[in-house]
Amino acid sequence: MTDALLPAAPQPLEKESDGYFRKGCNPLAQTGRSKLQNQRAALNQQILKAVRMRTGAENLLKVATNHKVREQVRLELSFVNSDLQMLKEELEGLNISVGVYQSTEEAFTVPLIPLGLKETKDIDFSVVLKDFILEHYSEDSYLYEDEIADLMDLRQACRTPSRDEAGVELLMSYFIQLGFVESRFFPPTRQMGILFTWYDSLTGVPVSQQNLLLEKASILFNIGALYTQIGTRCNRRTQAGLDGAVDAFQRAAGVLHHLKETFTHTPSYDMSPAMLSVLVKMMLAQAQENVFEKICLPGIRNEFFVLVKVAQEAAKVGEVYRQLHTAMSQAPVKENIPYSWASLVCVKAHHYAALAHYFAATLLIDHQLKPGADEDHQEKCLSQLYDHMPEGLTPLATLKSGHQRRQLGKSHLRRAVAHHEESVREASLCKKLRNIEVLQDVLSVAHERSRLKYAQHQDDDDLLNLIDAPDIISKTEQEVEIILPQFSKVTATDFFQKLGPLSVFSANKRWTPPRSIHFTAEEGDLGFTLRGNSPVQVHFLDPHCSAALAGAKEGDYIVSIQDVDCKWLTVSEVMKLLKACGRDGVEMKVVSLLDFTSSMHNKCATYSVGMQKTYSMICLAIDDDDKTDKTKKISKKLSFLSWGTDKNRVKSASTLCLPSVGVARPQVKKKLPSPFSLLNSDSSLY
C-alpha cells in the first residue's frame, strides 16, 4: 500500500520507508463505529440468506402442481418475507444510528445523517493477475507476487478507513490504483474471472459482477460516505468545526454527484441515479444547516437587522429540507429510502420553518420604530422579508404602527407554534426518532419558547385577528455548492510499473513475445537510429545491417540490452548501453506491436440474488416496451448491463497460450464508447 509520488522512472519500492504502507483502522478495535459496521456486515449475510430462500420458494411455487405443496410453500414464503421485513428494519436502525457518528463534544444540536460504508467480500487477485502477466506480458509472474500482495493489502485496508482526511486519501489512492490495474490487466474484449461483490448500503442486498467498474463505483460511494461521517464528527460548537462540517458535506455531495454522472447504470439501489440525486440534495441540505448554525454560534443579538438576516437564513434551511422531503417521497426512491431518514428530514423542514417565523415575530414585536432610526433601511428590509405584504398592510405603515406590528408578529408566532407542533408530531410517529433524546429535547425547547412568547402577548381579541402571516423569503449569505473530488492531489505509484510505461504496455495492446537479437556494430555503426521516449523504438533500420539480419524490424520496442531492463530508459540512456557493449556484440531483446484491436465492451455478468427491479432495470424496461415480443424474450436472457452479444465475446486464453509472432487479432467493430477510464468524467456503463 502506497501513497508515494510517481517517479519519472521506476524505482524500487522501499517498503521499509515511512509512508509506504497506509493502513486502515484496526478491524478488531471495538469502537462504536466498528461495532456498527460489524453489525451491518452480519445483517448483510442474514439478508443474503433470506433473499436466497425467498427466491427458491418463489421458483418452487411456480413449478409445483400439488395443492398441499403449494400451500406449504406459500406459508414458508410468508415467514421469509416477514423475516426480510424485520431485517430491513434492523438495517434501517443502523442507518439512523446517528449518535455513534456525532461529535464527542456534548452539543444541544439537531443530529446529522451520515452514510454507512458499503461492505464487500474478500477477493484473491493473485491467480488471475499471474496468469495474465505470463500470457499477455510474457514475463515471470512470480516476480510480481509482492506487488499483487500490496494491491490486496490496500483493498483490505480500504474496508476499515479512518474517519479523517487520511482515510479519504487511502480510498482515493486505491481508486487511482484501480485505474492502473484496469489499464494493465482488464482488456475490454474479455472478462478476467474476478467476481466483485458489494452489498447495498440501504437494502443490504448483494450485487456481484465480473467487472472492475463495480469496484470503482463502490469505492467512490464509500469516499462520499466517509466524508459524511467526517462532517457529522466535527465539533459544531466551534467556528472551525462548523467550517469543517460544511466543507465535508459539500465534498460528499461532490463525490456522489461525480458517481452519478460517471456511472449512469448501476445494479444497486444506493448507487442508482435517482437515489444519488436525493443523497446529493441531503448532503447540501445538511451543509446549509451548518451554515445557519455558524451564523447563530456567536449568539443572536436582539436587533432588527440581525433578526431579519437570521429569519431568512432559517427559512432557507427549511426550504431545502422541504424540497429534499419532496424528492424522497417520489418513486422509485420512496420504496428504498429509510423511513427514519424521511421522517427526520420532514421534522427539520418544519423545525426551521418555525424558527424563521419565530425570529420574524421577534423583530416585529420587540422593536418599535424610534425617532432617529434608519426608517428607509428598515422599510426596505421588511419589504424584502416577504414576497407580498398581508392585505391592507404596507411596510412603512406597519413599522410605524405598534398595533399592526403586534398583530402581524402574533400571526407569525401562531404559524411558528403550528410548525413546531407538526415537527414534534412527525418525530413521535417514528420509533427511531423517539429514541434520539437530543432531538426530542431540541424540539420541545423550541416549541415551548414559541408557545411562551405567544402567551405573553396573547389578547382576548386575538380571535378577531384576521391577518395571516405570509411566507418568509429564504436568503443566505453563503450558498452551498458541490465540491468535486480532486484526485490529482492524491497520486499513487503504479504497483506494476515494472511492466513498462502504461501508454504502451497495457491490456489494450498486443505484442509478439520478446525476441533475442544478437548483432555487432560495424565500425561503430548500429545500422539504425532510436526514437521515442520510454520505451525506445528502432528507427531508420538499414535492411542490410547486422541487426536487421538478426531479426530486428522497423518500429520494434527495445525492452532489454545485455539483460538490463530498458522499458523505462530514454534514448540517451539506451544509446549509452549500446555503445558500452564490447566486441562480443549486442544482446538485445525487442517486441513488435501487433495490429491494433479495437476495444469492445465485455458482456457484464450481473448477479443479484432475488433483487427487485432497480432504477436502471426500470429505465431499460420502459425502453423495451416498443420492441417486439421476440426481442423481449431474447433481451431477458441477457444481463441488463450487457455489452455485445455472445458471438463477440473472446474466450479467455490459457496461461500457456502465448501470443504468436506475426499473427494479428481480427478487427472488431467498436459498438459502444470506451469504459470509464481513470479520472475520466465521461458517462459510462458497467
Swiss-Prot record:
Superkingdom assignment: Eukaryota
REM-1 domain segment(s): 26-100
SUPFAM superfamilies: HR1 repeat (SSF46585), PDZ domain-like (SSF50156)
Modified residue annotations for Phosphothreonine: T655
Record's keyword terms, sorted: Coiled coil, Cytoplasm, Phosphoprotein
Residue ranges of domain BRO1 in the record: 111-460
Main location (coarse class): cytoplasm
Tissue: Mainly expressed in thyroid.
Pfam families assigned: BRO1, HR1
Cellular compartments annotated: Cytoplasm, Perinuclear region
Family annotation (PROSITE patterns): BRO1, PDZ, REM_1
Region described as Interaction with Rho: 46-66
Gene Ontology annotations for the cellular component aspect, listed alphabetically: cytosol; perinuclear region of cytoplasm
UniProt record, GO biological process: negative regulation of stress fiber assembly; signal transduction
Annotated ranges, domain PDZ: 515-593
Induction of synthesis: By thyrotropin (TSH).
Purpose: Binds specifically to GTP-Rho. May function in a Rho pathway to limit stress fiber formation and/or increase the turnover of F-actin structures in the absence of high levels of RhoA activity.
Quaternary context: Interacts with GTP-bound RhoA and RhoB. Interacts with both GTP- and GDP-bound RhoA. Interacts with KRT18.
Family: Belongs to the RHPN family.
Name listed for the protein in its UniProt record: Rhophilin-2
Record organism: Canis lupus familiaris
